[in-house]
Amino acid sequence: MIMQTSSVAEESSAKEVEVKKQVVSNPQLGIEIGLLTGCQDRPYAFGLAMALISKGVDLDIIGGDEIDSRELHTTPRLRFLNFRGDQKKQGNIAMKFWKLLDYYAKLIRYAARCKPKVLHILWNNKVEILDRSILMLYYKAIGKKIALTAHNVNQARRDAKDSWLNRVTLKIQYQLCDHIFVHTEKMKEELCQDFDVVEKAVTVIRHPVNDAFPDTELTPTEAKRRLGLKDDEKAILFFGRIRPYKGIEYLLDAFRLLPADEQAKYRLIVAGEPKKGSEDYLRQIRESVQRDFKEGQVILRIEFLPDEEMEVYLKGADVLVLPYKEIFQSGVLFLAYSFGLPVVATDVGSFREEIVEGSTGFLCQPGDPADLAKAIEIYFNSDLFKNLRVRRQEVKDYAHANHSWHAVAELTYKAYTKMLERNAS
């Protein structure tokens, strides 16, 4: 296991102090919001919460242990309600059922009694069909305004699992929302065309940079050492949940196509835990690695990665590769940018809008290992890689200039005020 970096506590404390300074300097009052996290995606929930609080919004954050952090208990104007607890505890089916039932009961009671007139859903909960229909109808019946961040307009279609019931319940949820946030114009277009959502009820907010993880004084050289790599080895990283639509098999094929005389210098790291239901896909990946590569060429770290280990991978790698078959946008891209790591990605979704070729990364065709291998070669022969120690800061600067949480908070705050104005009238 990778050793924890020594400055994690100091980094977290510094972020907390900065947030408190912003809160004190902004005395604006009057807006109270209930942020429903679905007990997942802590970086997004944390980033949005801190940005909204800096604008003077009072927040209730509803979640579980996976969302929890010290700042959620010490930041002014923020109340963290841990309704879900530890979702990873082992137990029989009956115990899991009762825990889930208890969570929904707490959520229903909260909605009935809470001060916030606006509930902002970041993610649905475990029983999505229930969340999209009955829970939405309940929120509206008790007079709540509903905002929703649709990170994926129709995830089931992307995963080839679409159904009539999925589309109907999605339409119910989208139609009952007072406002919806999406990350790209293409997502807005699909939302309006496929689910008859009115355009003025949708705001496009560019996916913000993911800066919720510690970024210490750890150097790339030290990070490589912790990963078991030599400083002159070229480290290619795939990072994130292991799922079929992410195209890891194409990355393995592309890795085999890299120049034979350079093979000894390349290392591929696949790091992340599998999404439930992706066990067969993971088995195929493991078999391919064992069959087609020499020992040590491909490093599989198939496990949950603690926050303090994120920077080890993102500083130790020389490039992040996203060989996705299909996607609208990816938070992993912006996590890489927050550490100044360039990205090679397939030309799907919004990647063409988010990757500046030659400056923050390169694009290739989806489902084409040869083109992916070519893009990786182009990257390692480019000035972007040859001057990576300097160019990392430029990638960071680009990300914070174009994908700031401040901009997200501005647009989100405006939507909240309009919703409340309509409620008052």
Regions found by a protein language model. Give the residues of each.
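Acidic donor-binding loop of glycosyltransferase active sites
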Residues: 312-328, 341
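Short hydrophobic beta-strand element within catalytic cores of glycosyltransferases
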Residues: 342-345, 355
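Conserved acidic donor-binding segment of nucleotide-sugar-dependent glycosyltransferases
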Residues: 357-358, 362-369, 378-384
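A charged, aromatic-enriched C-terminal amphipathic alpha-helix characteristic of glycosyltransferases
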Residues: 389-418
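Nucleotide-activated donor-binding/catalytic signature segment of Leloir-type glycosyltransferases, i.e.
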Residues: 282-311
